[in-house]
């Protein structure tokens, strides 16, 4: 009888590394393939969601044309779901049944309590005011942060004054959120008591986007007034 111990075969470190590398590569290919396979569908769903939000904040709109406001203070059309060029600001022009401009809509975002609060707001050129907003995405605390959607006093902030300054460098007055009950100016947002951070996010998102966009739109009103 052979008394020599039978030792199990060992796997070298190099072989283990090769195996793990192969597994990682296969997993990577699967993940990339899944991402590429669903990318178009995800983007289309996002486009549809934003389009619905535009119709919500501009009720008179029956059709939408997507534009980009360029750093040169000109505007140009972009395809549906398209991306604005570098340095440009994307916006949506809503037109009524007669092809007349019913309002402008644009996205904005700012840090909320849990994460960024992404909104889409409507701007009326005749009154130089933000008339409404809709939430595109947020992760605020249910029952607290999401009060911005239903709180009647908060929604009464709109229309919100957003006049462009005479020199077209920005807004005549910064849109800012103030403590609940202390609003005295038409460009101030009266915060929700207990949801101040989310309220501030809405005000900042609107202000930052409006400061960048509206001065570029002002010189191009004639181009936007009629759907072409």
Per-region residue spans from a language model:
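Flexible, solvent-exposed loop/hinge segments and secondary-structure transition points
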Residues: 2-228
């Amino acid at each position: 009888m052979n008394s020599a111990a039978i030792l199990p075969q060992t796997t070298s470190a190099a072989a283990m590394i090769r195996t793990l590398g192969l597994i990682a590569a296969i997993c990577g290919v699967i993940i990339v393939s899944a991402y590429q396979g669903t990318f178009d569908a995800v983007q289309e769903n996002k486009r549809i969601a934003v389009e619905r939000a535009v119709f919500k904040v501009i009720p008179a709109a029956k059709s939408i044309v997507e534009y980009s406001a360029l750093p040169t203070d000109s505007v140009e059309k972009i395809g549906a779901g398209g991306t604005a060029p570098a340095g440009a600001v994307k916006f949506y022009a809503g037109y009524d049944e007669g092809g007349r401009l019913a309002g402008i809509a644009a996205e904005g975002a700012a840090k909320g309590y849990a994460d960024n609060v992404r909104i889409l707001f409507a701007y009326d050129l005749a009154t130089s005011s933000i008339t409404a907003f809709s939430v595109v995405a947020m992760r605020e605390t249910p029952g607290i942060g999401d009060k911005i959607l239903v709180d009647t006093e908060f929604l009464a902030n709109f229309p919100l004054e957003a006049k462009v300054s005479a020199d077209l460098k920005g807004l005549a007055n910064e849109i800012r959120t103030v403590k609940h009950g202390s609003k005295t100016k038409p460009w101030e947002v009266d915060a929700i008591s207990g949801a101040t951070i989310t309220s501030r996010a809405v005000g900042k998102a609107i202000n930052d986007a409006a400061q960048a966009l509206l001065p570029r739109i002002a010189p191009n009103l004639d181009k936007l007034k009629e759907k072409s």
